[in-house]
A protein has these predicted regions:
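Extended low-complexity intrinsically disordered regions
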Residues: 221-258
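Short, charge-rich amphipathic segments
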Residues: 13-27, 34, 38-46, 66-67, ...
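A diffuse structural propensity rather than consistent per-protein peaks
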Residues: 94-107, 126-127, 231, 235-238, ...
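Solvent-exposed soluble domains appended to multi-pass membrane proteins
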Residues: 244-629
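Hydrophobic residues in alpha-helical segments
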Residues: 97, 118, 207, 222, ...
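Feature for exported/extracytoplasmic and membrane-associated proteins, marking the mature portion
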Residues: 129, 158-164, 171-236, 344-369, ...
């Protein structure tokens, strides 16, 4: 045994020179593996020189920092690199699998709440990627093991000088390349065209995580994302520019139309459906909801873009305020502290309506208790409604008298049972409907692997639970004579993103990964006695607030909404993050390669200006500072 230890010591001593090169190679491998296996996530080539320069410079910098440390510190540094960047690579992969976008530090605003819904099924990473991450960690581990002990008498200045030179070279490279990618100060204007081919604009905004990671590599992406996400380089908001925007906006909103005041005096039951995608809303799976859709005013071109990775809160906030949340640079606390005088709850409350919000989860999830209070409505959890199992939407009927009070009311309900994962982890949702779901799926003609079909069956069973609640709710409204004076609005928070196999999801929706149709979701009003109607206009949740205030005849200044009345003569363009948009013909994003017309330039200027105005309104707490109410 002693002989083997001596041999290992000798080998370790002879290979000590390889410690720092192994550290460098391990760091490079983390980036190369992530970008190679997700190279289809954007239009940037894997061999793009900027990513390799950034990665080489950052890897050299981190290796140089380790080299400056004493042996124990060097080993610790390499261990930290291995664990941190290994986990970060896994997080990027998981986030991309779920949301189709890489991780950004802005996601940490809601990370604690999102973690409560985490499932091991989301760790479905490619084996080759996992192997590459493990190999990179092993390279760093071996590099740490090979770090030589202190050698008294041996001069340290060559190592320190070399490390300092490497750090200096790395910093110069990163700074120069960073500056070259940023646009000149006089080339960017608030209303300028979103040029999908402008690398400078994408790098400045740094909101397109896929494009930016592929363009800059793992390490520069991490550093710049941290700076942008936490607003460390944000300049003060120019309130005068916002004043000008809203003055111009006053002349752009739709005026009164044939739908103005159509529902005046009626109550509104606004129901946001958790994960009820188009492929679930069928007569076989959700007969109650489907019947209401066919009898109501159906918006067949409704889309729910995700400005935040917290998809439910994303659509919740947008639909209640008519504002678009900032992708980066804002603390989640602004939703609880900013002034939102034009929220739907405040507008209905001013008309004497009883207002409230209802969801099965606790008030702490996404800080709904404080946020909803700030928006003007009291939040009621499943426990307050008397539910035994918060996962079962049908048990929300225990709180019926709370969300259907006497007199006119505005009640906001968020369902839960459609939530993923679609596995046995939430088997208590599936169980009451499992046999019915199996029978319906067997008749559907949907074909895939056994694993996919099992998930699909769970998803159908989850939807059936939500449909049971809707059926019981409408029946009780009818029995109580309240259906005649109550308008129901149903819309979905986000597409059905919880299926593990995304190709199977695309098959179900009949779309490709980069199609805007992936984001098309149900949205319709139902009012008893009203003739069925199909609306072809292209709309989104940001259009709900101005539509509702017009339908209910509320005296609201709609210039302060970023959307447009769904029945008005304005709008018809769906705003996507990063300045993108879709009007049914053109999907204008960073991947757009066609001819750019003047009309498209005008639409891009509008989309970009509205998004930035909304972000700056939130950043500055504009309504409070201008005392607008």
């Amino acid at each position: 045994m002693q002989e083997w230890k001596e041999k290992i010591r000798i080998v370790r001593g002879r290979l000590a020179w390889a410690s720092l090169p192994l550290c460098f190679c391990g760091l490079v491998l983390f980036d190369a593996a992530l970008r190679f296996f997700y190279r289809a996530a954007g239009s940037t080539r894997f061999l793009d020189w900027r990513a390799f320069v950034f990665t080489g410079a950052w890897s050299l910098l981190l290796t140089g920092v380790a080299a400056l440390l004493p042996p124990l510190g060097r080993r610790i540094a390499m261990g930290v690199y291995a664990v941190f960047f290994g986990l970060l690579s896994v997080v990027h992969g998981v986030m991309f699998n779920i949301f189709g976008e890489f991780f950004t530090f802005s996601d940490t605003n809601f990370a604690g709440d999102g973690a409560k819904f985490f499932s091991l099924s989301y760790l479905n990473l490619r084996k080759a990627l996992v192997a590459s991450i493990v190999l990179a960690m092993l390279l760093l581990a071996v590099g740490a093991w090979l770090v030589p002990k202190r050698q008294p008498g041996k001069p340290r200045w060559p190592r320190l000088a070399g490390a300092s030179g490497a750090i200096l070279l790395s910093l110069v490279s990163v700074v120069l390349l960073n500056r070259s990618l940023l646009p000149q100060a006089d080339t960017m204007t608030w209303g300028s065209l979103f040029d999908p081919n402008s690398e400078e604009q994408a790098y400045k905004d740094f909101t397109d995580s896929n494009r930016c990671l592929l363009m800059t590599g793992l390490y520069q992406y991490t550093a710049r994302d941290f700076v942008v996400s936490f607003g460390l380089e944000a300049s003060p908001v120019d309130l005068n520019s916002l004043d000008q925007f809203y003055e111009e906006r006053a002349g752009q909103v739709s005026g009164e139309n044939e739908y103005t005041g159509l529902y005046e005096g009626k109550s509104l039951l606004m129901v946001m459906l958790e994960s009820i995608d188009t492929w679930l809303l069928t007569p076989e799976y959700m007969p109650n909801l489907y019947a209401l859709q066919q009898q109501g005013t159906n918006f067949v071109h409704n889309y729910t873009p995700l400005f935040l990775s917290a998809g439910t809160f994303n659509t919740e906030f947008i639909s209640q305020t008519g504002l678009l949340p900032s992708v980066t640079g804002l603390s989640s606390s602004i939703y609880s502290t900013n002034s939102f005088p034009f929220s739907l709850a405040h507008q209905f409350s001013q008309q004497g309506y009883t207002v409230g919000s209802f969801h099965t989860a606790s008030a702490g999830i996404y800080s709904r208790g404080s946020i909803h209070q700030n928006l003007g409505m009291t939040y009621h959890s499943g426990a307050e409604m008397g539910m035994d199992d918060y996962m079962l939407d049908s048990q929300m009927m225990e709180g019926y008298d709370m969300f259907i009070p006497e007199g006119p009311f505005f009640s906001y309900i968020i369902t839960y049972s459609g939530h993923g994962p679609y596995t046995e982890e939430m088997g208590n949702i599936s169980a009451p409907h499992w046999e019915a779901a199996q029978a319906a799926v067997a008749q559907s003609g949907v074909e895939s692997t056994p694993a996919n079909l099992e998930e699909y069956t769970h998803a159908v069973a989850h939807a059936m639970e939500t449909d049971q609640f809707i059926g019981e709710l409408v029946a009780q409204l009818e029995a109580d004579g309240r259906l005649e004076d109550t308008v129901l609005l149903f819309y979905t928070d986000h597409y059905g993103k919880y299926l593990t196999d995304k190709e199977f999801l695309y098959q179900l929706k009949g779309v490709s990964a980069d199609s805007p149709e992936l984001y098309r979701t149900p949205c319709f009003f139902y009012a008893k006695g009203q003739q069925p109607q199909t609306v072809e206009k292209y709309v989104a949740p940001v259009d709900l607030a101005p539509t509702i205030v017009n339908l209910f005849g509320l005296d609201t200044d709609t210039r302060y909404y970023m959307g447009d009345d769904m029945f008005g003569d304005q709008g018809g363009v769906v705003l996507f993050p990063d300045g993108g948009w879709y009007d049914g013909e053109t999907y204008y994003t960073s991947d757009y390669q066609g001819e750019v017309t003047q009309e498209m330039r005008d639409t891009s200027a509008m989309a970009r200006r509205r998004e930035e105005a909304s972000f700056n309104t939130l950043r500055a707490d504009y309504f409070a500072r201008r005392e607008i109410s």
